[in-house]
A protein has these predicted regions:
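ATP/NTP phosphate-donor binding region
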Residues: 1-88, 341
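Short Gly/Thr/Asp-enriched flexible loops that form oxyanion-binding sites at enzyme active sites
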Residues: 77-78, 97-111, 144-145
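Glycine/serine-rich anion-binding loops at beta->alpha junctions
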Residues: 86-102, 136-142, 273
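Short alpha-helical scaffolding segments that buttress acidic/His motifs in well-ordered protein cores
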Residues: 194-198, 238-249, 286, 327, ...
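Active-site segments that bind and position negatively charged phosphate/pyrophosphate groups
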Residues: 200-326
Length: 385
């Protein structure tokens, strides 16, 4: 087991009707920046619930956070936050809005008004604004982790940032907010969460039975309840998927294990270049990447196939192959693409993806740092075959 330190201070308030808890989570009189995206929270009633719960607070608002939040938009939000002298940022939305809020919390207090390079180097202000959130789309686990994935249009980059101080102080998770989501959003969320688990689980075998066992439970939960969520969007399915997606990336299953994240880095590049939904880039890349790395990952792939999918094969190579095939089939069942041809007329250029990774300094990927740009090309070419 790799040495680790684990701390997750985010207060989770889970269940239907819990948006009303904002009235005691944020003290009366607090100046709040309400941050959200394209306005769906106004159509589904969440916005009005938030306003009712914060009746005694002083609100400033910033709308228009993109699905892949833009650094340039966050800079504008920072000006609003400074002018309103807010004491907390409240993100209401999915992972993109929450990512933006966590990044924004440091931008507001940074002396450098263009802090991208500082933050990319891990240099954050000592004092930042607190962040709270109301989750409306489960997928990323952003509501209780320290990571923000931000795109800079000027730099033509999409990269992750990590700042423990920006981890939300609280997260309200009301599964009822998912009732208005369409099947594409729901399918994306399930596959994103599934991939988060896989990238922490299918790596180097270690003495981590607790982490592996919990990862397998989460994967089986998403396999069982993800399709049910698409079929009837029931209260039970919403609850189970929302909680599993949170547990997939709150730090717990990643303790003491080597982590991969190569699928995510390649996926970020594809999204930055072509605007394809984040989860759909993961479903395009992961099956091919697992086949490419099947020999190195064979022990864990075979365990995965047997413990998660119930594969009976006793030969590890055969079990691993079946596990990858079943994963690809699951992505299709959730309505996501698994081949570049599935996103036509977009044509994904391996050269362009590699160029993005090189600009981002992501030239050695995977848990062994053994995936080079040349291998990224092979993975993308294999995906198209």
């Amino acid at each position: 087991m790799v040495k680790f330190e684990f701390r997750n201070p985010t207060r989770i308030v889970f269940g239907e009707g819990q948006i009303a808890a904002l009235q005691y989570l944020i003290p009366v009189g607090t100046r709040v920046l309400l941050l959200y995206g394209g306005g769906s929270i106004k159509r589904n009633g969440v916005y009005n619930q938030v306003l009712a719960a914060l009746e005694g607070c002083k609100l400033a608002e910033f709308a228009g956070i993109e699905v892949n939040p833009h650094y340039e938009t966050i800079l504008r939000a920072a000006e609003v936050a400074r002018q309103a002298n807010v004491g907390i940022i409240l993100a209401v939305g999915g992972g993109s809005v929450i990512d933006a809020a966590k990044f924004l919390a440091s931008v507001v207090t940074a002396e450098n008004r263009d802090p991208w390079d500082d933050f990319a180097a891990g240099l954050y202000p000592q004092e930042i604004l607190p962040v709270g959130c109301v989750l409306t789309l489960p997928a990323t686990g952003s509501e209780s982790n320290a990571v923000s994935v931000i795109s800079s249009i000027e730099r033509d980059l999409k990269i992750p940032f990590a700042n423990e101080a920006a981890r939300p102080t609280f997260a309200i998770m009301d599964p009822a907010t998912m009732a208005s989501l369409d099947k594409r959003q729901l399918g994306n969320g399930v596959v994103d969460a599934f991939t988060h688990v896989v990238e922490q689980y299918l790596t180097i075998p270690g003495n981590t039975p607790v982490q592996y066992g919990y990862s397998e439970v989460l994967l089986r939960t998403l396999i069982e309840w993800g399709p049910k969520l698409l079929e009837d969007n029931s209260a039970e399915a919403r609850e189970n998927v929302m909680w599993a997606a949170n547990q997939a990336l709150n730090g717990l299953i990643g303790t003491g294990v080597r982590q991969d994240w190569s699928t995510h880095m390649i996926g970020h590049a594809i999204t930055a270049i072509y605007g394809i939904d984040h989860a759909r880039t993961l479903s395009l890349v992961m099956p091919s990447l697992l086949r490419f790395k099947a020999d190195r990952k064979q022990v864990m792939l075979a365990r995965y196939a047997r413990n998660v999918w119930g594969v009976a094969a006793t030969d590890d190579k055969m079990a691993a192959e079946q596990g990858i095939d079943l994963t690809e089939g699951f992505f299709r069942r959730m309505g996501l693409p698994v081949k570049p041809a599935d996103v036509a007329p977009i044509e994904i250029s391996p050269d362009d993806v590699i160029a993005h990774l090189q600009r981002a300094g992501q030239i050695r990927l995977g848990e062994m740092a053994d995936i080079t740009p040349l291998q990224v090309r092979d993975i993308l070419v294999h995906a198209a075959s």
